């Protein structure tokens, strides 16, 4: 298999043109461009697919999509210096016939894989390492018709920086039960952070769809006001998600996810509340993966974590924690009656997105994309509706519980 020499590519009026290699200027949040490090790129042909690994000097945002006529897979990065990149590393995959790399637009770099057959990304993950980060992609063959249906440039994928303003005015919070319950639904990931991916299903897409359906269920029921942290394929930093909840004086913050495990056979829904120490090692790693999204987006969370820590110290949590516990209990009770939950349905971990001290906050893993059964559930409209109704009933039950608690503790 012959590969062309590594080259830069640019787009003008929709037409790709080939340029000679040149250095790229640093852009956006990174001190320097990510370098292709060590072994650079490796591809292992498995016969029924291929595994691609790209070693970088630091983690960067990325997105993947496919194109037809001819068959191509495109991987955008923010941002990579391709100096020294050797495309010969791809000569072990029959599905890949050529590779081109270069600048895409200011702040972004692109890799284009020419394909000999239709393939899909079965799993995608960028893992931090001591040397930087490695992007792992698992490719598998798919039918021509499926490839065509999934292909196309993602027009709505955007990236919001941490400093972008949230145009929401302050709203006064009222006692629980004295008015509509104001619920902030947080569909995890989005934009350049797709979350977990399995069999062509992206966590960001599935959670957005579920959040929109859950919003509709709550609004139709009456007694709820619902705000989504994102309503399209947009990347929203963790701090911004928290800011949205506080800006609208949320009564409840519910973050929705569907993670994937590299090992084990875990399945079923799991509910997480905030704790400094995770329930177990798996919960700790899960929190690290979720929080890594902002790192991948080039956002420095160190100062923000200090701010959040100060808020946690300054604000009384003696009221919020019991309310969160009662909310978690209500959710587990209703969900267990309606859908299958994990053998440990409620756990704790240090998710940054739950660190709003004055808003009861829950992270709900609706299932594991690494579980075929859970994947089937997440794409099943009937299952999603059943889960949404259970959450609606749990929120209603929690309102009654809080009203009773308020009456009993009234001076």
Question: How would you name each of these model-derived features?
Answer:
Residues 7-21:
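Bacterial N-terminal signal peptides
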Residues 62, 225-226, 361-364:
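Hydrophobic anchor at the start of a short beta-strand
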Residues 63-65, 84, 192-196, 281, ...:
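Short, solvent-exposed loop/turn elements at domain surfaces
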Residues 312-411:
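Active-site-adjacent mobile loop/cap segments within catalytic or ligand-binding domains
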Residues 153-306, 317-329, 385, 389, ...:
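Catalytic-core regions of hydrolytic enzymes
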Residues 56-58, 77-79, 115-117, 137-141, ...:
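Flexible glycine-/small-residue-rich
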Residues 2-3, 24-182:
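Signal-peptide-cleaved, periplasmic/extracellular N-terminal interaction regions immediately downstream
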């Amino acid at each position: 298999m012959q590969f062309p020499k590594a080259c830069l590519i640019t787009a003008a009026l929709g037409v790709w043109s080939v340029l000679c290699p040149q250095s790229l200027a640093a852009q956006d949040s990174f001190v320097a461009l990510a370098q292709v490090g060590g072994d650079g790129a490796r591809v292992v042909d498995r016969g029924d697919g291929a595994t691609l690994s790209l070693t970088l000097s630091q983690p960067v945002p990325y997105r993947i999509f496919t194109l037809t006529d001819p068959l191509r897979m495109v991987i955008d990065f923010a941002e990579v210096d391709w100096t020294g990149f050797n495309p010969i590393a791809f000569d072990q995959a029959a599905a890949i016939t050529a590779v081109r790399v270069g600048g895409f637009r200011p702040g972004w770099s692109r890799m284009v894989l020419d394909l000999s057959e239709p393939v899909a990304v079965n799993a995608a993950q960028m893992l931090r390492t001591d040397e930087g980060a490695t992007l792992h992609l698992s490719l598998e063959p798919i039918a021509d018709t499926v490839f065509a249906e999934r292909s196309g440039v993602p027009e709505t994928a955007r990236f919001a920086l941490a400093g972008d303003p949230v145009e929401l005015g302050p709203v006064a919070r009222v006692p629980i039960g004295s008015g509509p319950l104001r619920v902030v639904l947080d569909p995890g990931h989005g934009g350049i952070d797709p979350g977990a991916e399995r069999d062509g299903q992206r966590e960001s897409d599935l959670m957005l769809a579920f959040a929109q359906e859950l919003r509709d269920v709550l609004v139709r029921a009456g007694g709820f006001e619902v705000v989504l942290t994102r309503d399209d394929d947009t990347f929203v930093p963790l701090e911004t998600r928290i800011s949205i909840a506080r800006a609208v004086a949320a009564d409840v913050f519910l973050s929705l996810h569907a993670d994937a495990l590299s090992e084990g056979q875990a399945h079923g829904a799991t509910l997480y509340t905030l704790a400094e120490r995770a329930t177990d090692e798996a919960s700790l790693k899960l929190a690290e993966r979720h929080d890594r999204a902002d790192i991948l987006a080039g956002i420095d969370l160190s100062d923000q974590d200090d701010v959040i820590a100060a808020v946690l110290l300054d604000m009384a949590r003696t009221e919020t924690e019991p309310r969160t516990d009662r909310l978690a209990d209500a959710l587990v009770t209703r969900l267990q009656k309606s859908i299958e939950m994990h053998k440990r349905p409620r756990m704790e971990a240090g998710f940054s997105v739950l660190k709003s001290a004055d808003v009861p906050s829950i992270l709900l893993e609706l299932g594991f994309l690494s579980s075929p059964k859970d994947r089937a559930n997440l794409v099943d409209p009937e299952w999603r509706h059943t889960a949404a109704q259970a959450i609606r009933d749990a929120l209603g039950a929690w309102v009654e519980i809080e009203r009773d608690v308020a009456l009993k503790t009234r001076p």
